[in-house]
From Swiss-Prot:
Homodimer. This is Glyoxylate/hydroxypyruvate reductase B. Belongs to the D-isomer specific 2-hydroxyacid dehydrogenase family. GhrB subfamily. It catalyses: glycolate + NADP(+) = glyoxylate + NADPH + H(+); (R)-glycerate + NAD(+) = 3-hydroxypyruvate + NADH + H(+); (R)-glycerate + NADP(+) = 3-hydroxypyruvate + NADPH + H(+).
């Protein structure tokens, strides 16, 4: 008899078929208390869980006594109670490598669109304001040869540094938990403390996961140390930034502009002051959102769940020690 798994995110037909070759698959719309209650017997028997954008906490785990592995269609896993999973020896799988290049593309797009005011001036053209040769009030700022500061030199940070260094001749500063020899050798990147990075960078790109240590890592103090001409980019996790402090820094002119793919609360409230600022490019968490990459992430998540329930955790596992 095939193991039972719960799928709470739609999959392309071929990937669903692959999952069904290995498991009895039960599809649900979400992981809300109502859904769990209505499908209590299914949750009680499930050994695997696959999906994204839902909280997996101790309360849910209490309804799933046979659960052995969870697989998220994402690199981030801050919506999972890792401690509770680990205590139950439940594997948590994620997709850290599939989306690297695509997210780096998004970061570079935010750098370019904020510096060159692409969204703002495009809207002005659509509004009929382009009635003569443009003047300084339409101008942006250069990207090439400007200093890029990267906070978080992981896979995505490396991919961004590659684009910036080779494509735009940008000097690279970085801050991370440890020195990154490859970044220093390939991109002539310079490790520095966070304060120095903030003070010297023309663009500050934040690419950090959300943890207890990174929550509100960026606040009024950090924005106050940046150049008034600096542009802030966040494509990591929204709560790493104190959004009210960011809004205040933009309103006071402490920083020049911001390009944001993530926010403290998502979706972003229509009343957010960020949406009324011409110098803010706000996009709806599109970091990995291309057809090709989202398919690749889903395929990886399916393979991860198959591997996990077969006892293979050589890669893509957040807590591999529970399999020992």
């Amino acid at each position: 008899m095939k193991p039972s798994v719960i799928l709470y995110k739609a999959l392309p037909d071929d990937l669903l078929q692959r999952l069904q070759e290995h498991f009895t698959v039960h599809q649900v719309a979400n992981l809300s208390p109502q859904t769990i209650e209505q499908n209590a017997a299914i949750f009680a028997e499930a050994e695997g869980l696959l999906g994204s954008n839902e909280n997996v906490d101790a309360a849910l785990l209490g309804k799933m006594p046979k659960l052995r592995a969870t697989s998220t269609i994402s690199v981030g896993y801050d919506n999972f109670d890792v401690d509770a999973l680990t205590a139950r020896k439940i594997l948590l799988m994620h997709t850290p490598t599939v989306l690297t290049e695509t997210v780096a593309d998004t970061l570079m797009a935010l750098v370019l669109s904020t510096a060159r005011r692409v969204v703002e001036v495009a809207e002005r053209v659509k509004a009929g304001e382009w009635t003569a040769s443009i003047g300084p009030d339409w101008y942006g700022t250069d990207v090439h040869h400007k200093t890029l500061g990267i906070v978080g030199m992981g896979r995505i940070g490396m991919a961004l540094a590659q684009r910036a260094h080779f494509g735009f001749n940008m000097p690279i500063l970085y801050n991370a938990r440890r020195h990154h020899k490859e970044a220093e050798e390939r991109f002539n990147a310079r490790y520095c403390d966070l304060d120095s990075l903030l003070q010297e960078s023309d663009f500050v790109c934040l690419i950090l996961p959300l943890t207890d240590e990174t929550y509100h890592l960026f606040g009024a103090e950090q924005f106050g140390k940046m150049k008034s001409s600096a542009i802030f980019i966040n494509a990591g996790r929204g709560p790493v930034v104190d959004e009210n402090a960011l809004i205040a820094a933009l309103q006071k002119g402490e920083i020049h502009a911001a390009g944001l793919d993530v926010f403290e609360q998502e979706p972003l409230s229509v009343d957010s002051p960020l949406l009324s600022m011409a110098n803010v490019v706000a996009v709806p968490h599109i970091g990995s959102a291309t057809h090709e990459t989202r398919y690749g992430m889903a395929a990886c998540a399916v393979d991860n769940l198959i591997d996990a329930l077969q006892g293979k955790v050589e890669k893509n596992c957040v807590n591999p020690h529970v399999a020992d």
